[in-house]
Amino acid sequence: MGTIAVRYCSKTKMGNTRRIAEAIAEGAGVTAVSILDEPKLTERTDLLLLGGAPYANIMAPELREYAESLDPALIGEVVLFTTSNWSRRTVIALKKILREKGIAVADSYFYAHMLQIESKMEAAKQFGAKFR
């Protein structure tokens, strides 16, 4: 497949998005990195797996800023993932931001309901493994 990167925004103590990101990364054979720890993607990647969850039903400002700062020349394609109680607004908003920047975004994405994280861990690993 080429180079793969997993980036995520997780701001709660529960760390649902972090856990799903780590499982996806394990399946893909890479390491998940928080955008709060490493705010810029500095090297070309063929596939960026990017995820976050809505907070108070809106995308985290840090995730929005990260998406807006991405350099289209550094990214082949983005595949999204999200964790939430009901809303997939984060995915919809990210698709819009990234596509307006000219970044290719896959139509399909990975979703894990916040109350079913444990039962979605294996599926997250398998999702990541598809991109090896």
Annotate the PLM regions:
Residues 2-37, 44-132:
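FMN-binding flavodoxin-like domain, especially the glycine-rich phosphate-binding loop
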